[in-house]
Every structure is written in structure tokens, then in C-alpha cells.
Design a protein with these regions (language model features):
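Active-site diphosphate/adenylate-binding microenvironment
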Residues: 6-9, 14, 19, 27, ...
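Phosphate/pyrophosphate-binding active-site segments
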Residues: 136, 197, 293-384, 508-512, ...
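Hydrophobic, well-ordered secondary-structure elements that form the walls
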Residues: 296, 368, 380, 419, ...
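N-terminal alpha/beta PP-like core and its mobile active-site loop of ThDP/TPP-dependent enzymes
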Residues: 1-331, 367, 371-374, 454-457, ...
């Protein structure tokens, strides 16, 4: 059939199983939006308040569903407004396709109105990017973009299409996309046999699971593996939910704000089996002392991660689901009762604690956890509230926690929550934010109200940039430079002005009724929770410090 380039873009999206697109129109992409008007029965376009919101929504949709998220923007500032969201997706390995339009090929390279070299701008933060100047290249490029976004280690791909291509016509033949086979060819039988030998020799094995377990769909295999080798399990922030957080062998998050049980346990283990994690600085602390008593096995789909941050004894490159499945089939059941008792003792001795006499962030998260039966999708922004959400909510399945881990993008959560709700309409969706993060992209409440998206935006308001202030308190002599936000902004009035219900909470007794009211509301709700400015996130590892030296408030008082 003879179609315009814009119609071909729509047909290619349908061919790839895309049902929802997030974006914002403009001059050079107007032909595509005209085509979307004719395809609106097949493609649901969500008009966000800002292109950054569109990129975060596409990211949230992808993380919540496991499918490729799609966002669109026009040339120039429209395209550059996607950059923060693309970078966020890149660092956290989210499959995303960003489609931008550029000026026509006849005026390309002449500093034309809203002309930006967006492929050059995004080259360091995409798996790959393309500029399409000839309509003959359009179909194979879009198909390739979706393949690259999903294949191996997922990530964002940008396709920039010149305006002439969106208007020209050519024949289009639909094609059924080929299933992407997991990468298995890079590891060997010898790799697996060596891993089994190391596991058999270990008396204190510890499993460290990252976001790669979730991307691979390997949670069931991880559960079987942990039971087979009789080992405790900890996770990265991105790996939350890869292993059921309510299971006895689960110890919590590892690293800077991980539990003492995880940090001390990894420091005491003799074999650390790392699956789909990249050993970021937030996890390892001082790399020279990290897991210094252990041999390390590193399973990852990306060969570039092996020995990048931590030198390992065995690197196995390939799909986590395939590798764990093969190991489970080959391994005999191991038993480590004394080691598990040692870990249980650490958990009992060092539980997560907070001041229960007053309203705090952890209390709010615990109430959300209780009232949703640990079944909600939790999105977050970045800071203290993010760590509380990671620590105090029980994630029982993959894709429950959606957060910016690697980039630490303030303003990520609200757009992500909107995208997550479109991807999983049957689950309650919360975005947990601090007052500093929320003000960055709070305009996306207008998107939620326009489409009546029933998300619950919780703003934990301490009137400061809480995490930065915590560092200033602990490491900068209490010199609070530009972290005080005690201003005249009324977030409840802002939310109401943007068409949302708003509830302010100032006492512990008001928290549960507010959450229940929000859950019963068919539409977006903001809950503003007023807490003290001196609340902190513990445990903590000092920047560059050893995870074996994790400390909490009691340790500081006893100094």
C-alpha cells in the first residue's frame, strides 16, 4: 500500500506492538501528528506538559511492562528536552525509542529554524541513533531501532526523521517482527562448570541481584537458584523485586543506604555471585575493600561490565535467565545452615529503624505498603524519599519499583508514574517525591488530570533538599548552602489548580485515611506530608568508605 512517511511511522509502531506513545507536537513533526490523528483508534497518544515528561513517561511505561517505551518530539528544543529522559533510560538500561523530526533535507545544515543535530547530542546516551533523510531508509531504520532497544542489554535508541521524509510516499509492506533470542552464545559449558565448582567449594555464598535479573525475566530462576545453593540474597536499587522481599533469605539492599545485614554479610561471605548488576560506586563503596574475603562470580549480558569496576574471579557473559536455568539443572542442592543462621542474626541485630514518636518518611512508606498489601507500583524521584521507598516497601515481584538509579534524575517520578499507569492500569501507582524533586516537573499533574490518570502523588515535604542537607550535616560541618526550600509554594493549591484532588497531612493519624481516600478516588490525587527537616536516611556508608563500615544514628551518638 502507498503511504506517506508519517503513515509508515504509525504502521511500523503498530507492527512493533506499540499501543501508547508519549509526546508533544511541533512544526517539523506535524506531518506525523496529522497521521496520528488518523491512527488514533490504534495508537493512543498521550500529550504531556513538557517533552521531558514524555521521555520519563515512556521510560516508566517500559519499566512497568517490559515493552519498548516510545516518545516523540519536534526538532530543536523539543528534541533537546528529551535528552535528560534519554540519559536516564540509558544509564538504567530501559528499552526506549525516541522519534524526533528535523528540518527538511534541502535546508539541513544551514542553521535553519529549530535545527539541532540531535543525533550528535544524543550519541553518548543512546545504544544507537539514526537520522533518516531518504524515505527508502525509513522502514528498516525503525525496525532496527526497536530491535536494538530490546536486544541484549536494553537501552534507548533515537530516530531523527527529516521533514521531507514524513511527507513523501512509498509502498509499505507490513512484517511480523522476529522474536529476539536471548544472548547465550557468549558463555561456555566450561564457564558453568567452573561456577558450579566454586559454588560447591563455598561455605558462605551470597547472591547479589541487579536490574539485569528483571530485564531478563529471571526472577523465578533466581528464586530456584537461591534455594538450590542455600544462599541469602541482596539486591541493588534497580534490582528491587527481582527476589521477593518478604522471603526469609532476603537481606535487603546493598551499598550506601543498604541494610547492615547486606553490607556486613557481603563483607563476610566467601563467594559473591553477582547477577545483572554493574558494581556501581553506590553499591561497592571502597572497591579495594569490597567483598574482600570472597571470590566473585559475575553474570551479565554486557561483556563491558565484566572487570570494569570490580575484578572478578569468573565472568559469565550471557542472558541471566538462560544461565541460571542451566545452573539450576546442573547443580546439586547445597546446605549452609550455619551461614544462614549468621545472616539471620545480622538481620535481627540490625533491623531498619526510625523515630516512631513523630511523622516521618519511613512511616508513610510503611502505611502505603500496608494499605496496598505490597501490591502497588512505586515510582520515585531522587533523594531521601527514594531511599525510604526502597527500604520500607516490600517489593514482591519485578517491575514494582520504578526509579532513576544511575542518573539520579530529580523530576523523573511523576512522568514515570503516568507511563506506568498506562502500562499497568489494574495496579495502584504511587509517585513518592520530595518537595525539591516535585517542583521540577510538577506540571505533569496537568497531564494526569487531563486524562484522569488515577495516580497518587505523595510529596514528602521537609522544606529542604533533604539528601544534600544530610551530607552537609554529616560531611560539611552543617554549612547549609542553598538547600533550604522554606518558601511560599502551596503544593496543594498547585495540584488543585492543575485539576487534581489534594490532601495535606501533618500527623501520623492522618496518614492512613489520606491514603485510603486517594486509593478510592477515580483520578489523580496529591498527598502532601509535612515532616521535619532533620530526618535522615540510615544506614549509610560514607562516600568512598567501606560497606563493612556502614553506620546508623546510634553509631553516630556512640562516637
Amino acid at each position: 500500500m502507498m503511504l506517506t512517511g508519517s503513515e509508515i511511522i504509525c504502521e511500523c509502531l503498530i507492527e512493533q506492538g506499540v499501543d501508547t506513545v508519549f509526546g508533544y507536537p511541533g512544526g517539523t513533526i506535524l506531518n506525523v501528528y496529522d497521521a496520528l490523528y488518523r491512527y488514533q483508534d490504534k495508537i493512543n497518544h498521550v500529550l504531556t506538559s513538557h517533552e521531558q515528561g514524555a521521555s520519563h513517561a515512556a521510560d516508566g511505561y517500559a519499566r512497568a511492562t517490559g515493552k519498548v517505551g516510545v516518545c516523540m518530539a519536534t526538532s530543536g528544543p523539543g528534541a533537546t528536552n528529551l535528552v535528560t529522559g534519554i540519559a536516564t533510560a540509558y544509564i538504567d538500561s530501559t528499552p526506549l525509542v525516541a522519534i524526533t523530526a528535523n528540518v527538511g533535507v534541502e535546508i539541513l545544515g544551514r542553521d535553519s529554524f529549530q535545527e539541532i543535530d540531535i543525533t550528535g547530542v544524543t550519541m553518548p546516551i543512546t545504544k544507537h541513533n539514526f537520522i533518516v533523510k531518504d524515505i527508502k531508509d525509513l522502514v528498516p531504520t525503525i525496525r532496527k531501532a526497536f530491535y536494538i532497544a530490546k536486544e541484549g542489554r536494553p537501552g534507548p535508541v533515537l530516530v531523527d526523521v527529516t521533514k521531507n521524509v514524513t511527507a513523501e510516499k512509498m509502498e509499505f509492506e507490513p512484517l511480523q517482527p522476529k522474536a529476539i533470542e536471548p544472548k547465550t552464545e557468549t558463555y561456555t559449558v566450561e564457564d558453568l562448570d567452573k561456577a558450579i565448582e566454586m559454588i560447591k567449594e563455598s561455605e558462605k555464598p551470597f547472591i547479589f541481584a541487579g536490574g539485569g535479573v528483571i530485564s531478563s525475566g529471571a526472577s523465578q530462576e533466581l528464586k530456584e537458584f537461591a534455594e538450590k545453593i542455600d544462599a541469602p540474597v541482596c539486591e541493588t536499587l534497580m534490582g528491587k523485586g527481582a527476589f521477593d522481599n518478604t522471603r526469609p533469605r532476603y537481606t535487603g539492599m546493598l551499598g550506601m543506604h543498604g541494610t547492615k545485614a547486606s553490607n556486613f554479610g557481603v563483607s563476610q561471605c566467601d563467594l559473591l555471585i553477582t547477577i545483572g548488576a554493574r558494581f556501581s560506586d553506590r553499591v561497592t563503596g571502597n572497591t579495594k575493600t569490597f567483598a574482600s574475603n570472597a571470590k566473585i562470580i559475575h553474570i551479565d549480558v554486557d561483556a563491558a561490565e565484566i572487570n570494569k569496576n570490580i575484578q572478578v574471579d569468573l565472568g559469565i557473559i550471557g542472558d541471566a535467565k538462560c544461565i541460571l536455568s542451566e545452573l539450576n539443572n546442573k547443580l546439586e542442592r547445597q546446605n549452609h545452615p550455619q551461614w544462614l543462621k549468621q545472616i539471620r542474626d545480622l538481620k535481627d541485630r540490625y533491623p531498619l529503624t526510625y523515630d516512631e514518636s513523630t511523622l516521618t518518611g519511613p512511616y508513610v512508606i510503611e502505611q502505603i505498603d500496608y494499605l496496598t498489601d505490597s501490591n502497588a507500583i512505586i515510582c520515585t524521584d531522587v533523594g531521601q524519599h527514594q531511599m525510604w521507598a526502597a527500604q520500607y516497601y516490600h517489593y514482591r515481584r519485578p517491575r514494582q519499583l520504578i526509579t532513576s538509579g544511575g542518573a539520579g534524575t530529580m523530576g523523573f517520578g511523576l512522568g514515570a508514574a503516568i507511563g506506568a499507569k498506562y502500562g499497568n492500569p489494574d495496579f495502584p501507582v504511587f509517585n513518592i517525591a520530595g518537595d525539591g524533586c516535585f517542583r521540577m516537573n510538577m506540571n505533569e499533574l496537568a497531564t494526569a488530570s487531563r486524562y484522569n490518570v488515577p495516580i497518587i502523588q505523595v510529596v514528602i515535604n521537609n522544606k529542604v533538599l533533604g539528601m544534600v542537607r544530610q551530607w552537609q550535616t554529616l560531611f560539611y560541618g552543617k554549612r547549609y548552602s542553598n538547600t533550604i526550600l522554606d518558601d511560599k509554594v502551596d503544593f496543594c493549591k498547585v495540584a488543585e489548580g492543575l485539576g487534581c484532588k489534594a490532601i495535606r497531612v501533618s500527623t501520623k493519624e492522618e496518614v492512613a485515611p489520606a491514603i485510603k481516600e486517594a486509593l478510592d478516588t477515580n483520578g489523580p490525587v496529591l498527598i502532601e506530608v509535612m515532616i521535619g527537616k532533620d530526618d535522615k536516611v540510615f544506614p549509610m556508608v560514607a562516600p568512598g568508605g567501606a560497606i563493612s563500615k556502614a553506620f546508623d544514628e546510634t553509631d553516630l551518638k556512640n562516637k
